[in-house]
Amino acid sequence: MKKLNQFMCIGAVGLLSVGLSAQGTDTQQPMQGDKKPMQGEMQHAKANMKAEQVIASWKPAPKMAAEAMIKKYGEPAEVTSMRIIWHNNGPWKYTEIMNQETEHNFPMPHKDAMHQAVNYKVDPSKADDILEYDGSIILNRTAGMIGAICDKEPANFLAVNLAHEVATGKKSVDEARKQYAMSIETMMKEKKMDKYTSGLIFEPPANAGFTDAPFGAMGTNGKK
């Protein structure tokens, strides 16, 4: 009889343990109406938080540019402590913003911070004129790109558009500089955008690179 009572007690304890275990398992499971965030959503939220955290302590010019581009184009493709980059955003091949400011006094004092570029076939004979018109123009003949570094996207549109007109002979260096100053004044004082600051006035080619050709003994591996 004593053994029977012990067996019954052990069985009762076992059943109680199973019941508590099952109850605990049920409470850990999400309710039917709950929805777990998708992996992509979690990564996007993490990237968004990271970009905002990174630029929070940046210098004024790059921080302002970064905030404007995030608002317009969404999250950058690359984020580091010193730079953020978008690829193929809008009409641009890329947009790069670094946490640094470069003093630039044309046409009025400001700080360059944002580099944006497009595909473009650069004519070497026009390079001097383009750079004389605006020193913040960036030319890369090998990759086939032209870009500008300024503090605002409309100013980069303006810089690249007028560089195109200098390259094509539509405007002289002086004419391009005068037009640049006029367009900036219209944008800053009248809060209006003209054709030069609203977007690109030309269609960038799909591929404009110039790979050049082998030269000298090194280029031909010693073969004649």
Where are these regions (language model features)?
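Bacterial N-terminal signal peptides that target proteins for export
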Residues: 1-10
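Bacterial N-terminal signal peptides
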Residues: 9-19
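Ubiquitous "structural anchor" signal
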Residues: 19-22, 177
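N-terminal propeptides/low-complexity segments immediately following signal peptides
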Residues: 24-43
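Non-cytosolic coordination micro-motifs
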Residues: 44, 50-94, 98-224
